[in-house]
A protein has these predicted regions:
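Distinct, well-ordered alpha-helical segments
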Residues: 43-50, 177-193, 209-223, 284-287
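Conserved, mostly hydrophobic/aromatic
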Residues: 59, 121, 202, 232, ...
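Acidic-and-aromatic substrate-binding clefts and catalytic sites of carbohydrate-active enzymes
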Residues: 43-44, 63-73, 94-104, 174-179, ...
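Gly/Pro-rich active-site loop or hairpin
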Residues: 70, 100, 138-148, 209-267
Length: 330
């Protein structure tokens, strides 16, 4: 029998306006409830709204937007972290690269974690550059036994350096290596078992990659080790005709909600994060989208959202749309 879900938040709110957990932990990490990304376009709203009225259980930051940032964005983050749990989500770890780990970046990441005290630190199963060149994209890697050993060694090194478990997200991909011999879901599962890292299951990325490469999305979700999944990402994508691209600029598509329900039922319920990084709407619209997530957990599929269409010549989404928002004028 599938676990029962209701449409209430995963957290209660105490008299001070801070959420109190009512859901169990996994890998020693709590179910944070329903959250959104902390973006500069919403700084003014958050700073002028009492925390008890924010309407979300937690926030996720793009780590690179706050590394070396001691300005107004840091002040907002400090205020938010005093009232809600925060998760650090990075895009520059490049865990799959053959280049040495960037120790300077890791030191800055560790320093930021010391300031923020995040619930966890996450990044992506990908590589972003080599030999000092940053592609500003989350690139797929060959999924082979050799690369599994390579990435596992790097994950252990990062975890030792940071002094905490690392959480890795499945990327959206638009090409594959002919040398790959391990399905991505098996690769992630073996990596999690070998390193005790957590998994961030992006169900939008699963749908995007499944459509692009022709694999079965439910099989992907069902094959991951549920006890390692600590978080789920929701986002919108763009249909480019021959392929889909993960663009984070529209509401969650209808095809993604059943995958979200499947993931939540399989895990017994884990933290949900709505990503929206371009064409960012008012904060109230994000709360409305989170309400859809609560309904979906109850088995009530939200109304169909329009899927935007793009041109066939786009093959990926650069990272610039995620970076820099913390530094925009407010």
């Amino acid at each position: 029998m599938s676990p029962a879900f209701d449409v209430s938040p995963a957290f209660d709110v105490n008299k001070a306006g801070e959420p109190e957990a009512v859901c169990p932990e996994r890998l020693g990490l709590p179910n944070l409830g329903d959250g959104v990304g902390l973006r500069s376009v919403h700084f003014r709203h958050l700073m002028h709204t009492p925390p008890r009225d924010w309407g979300v259980d937690w926030f996720e930051i793009i780590s690179e937007n706050f590394i070396d940032n001691r300005g107004y964005a840091a002040h907002v983050l400090e205020t938010v972290a005093a009232h809600r749990p925060v998760v650090m989500h990075g895009v520059s770890l490049s865990i799959g690269s053959s280049a040495p780990l960037d120790r300077d970046y890791l030191r800055k990441l560790r320093d930021l974690a010391a300031r923020v005290q995040p619930a966890w630190v996450s990044d992506h199963l990908c590589w972003t550059g080599i030999n000092g060149v940053n592609t500003h994209d989350l690139l797929p890697m060959p999924l082979t036994p050799e690369s599994l050993i390579h990435v596992a060694d790097r994950v252990r090194a990062v975890q030792d350096f940071l002094g905490r478990a690392l959480v890795l997200e499945n990327p959206s991909t638009y090409l594959q290596f002919q040398a790959s011999s391990i399905p991505e879901w098996e690769f992630l599962g073996m990596l999690a078992e070998a390193t005790s890292c957590g998994l961030l299951l992006d169900v939008n990325n699963v749908h995007v990659s499944a459509t692009n490469h022709g694999f079965d999305a439910p099989t992907y979700i069902d094959s991951l080790p549920a006890d390692h999944i600590v978080q789920v990402h929701l986002a919108g994508f763009t249909d480019h005709g021959t392929h889909l691209i993960d663009t984070h600029d529209h509401p969650v598509a209808a095809a993604v909600w059943p995958l979200y329900l499947r993931a939540q039922r399989r895990t017994g319920g884990v933290a949900t994060l709505l990503e929206w990084d371009a064409r960012i709407p008012p904060f109230a619209d994000l709360l409305h989208e989170l309400t859809k997530a609560r309904l979906a957990r109850a088995g009530v599929m939200p109304a169909v959202a329009r899927v935007p269409r793009g041109t066939a010549d786009s093959v990926s989404t650069p990272l610039q749309f995620q970076l820099g928002f913390a530094h925009e004028p407010v």
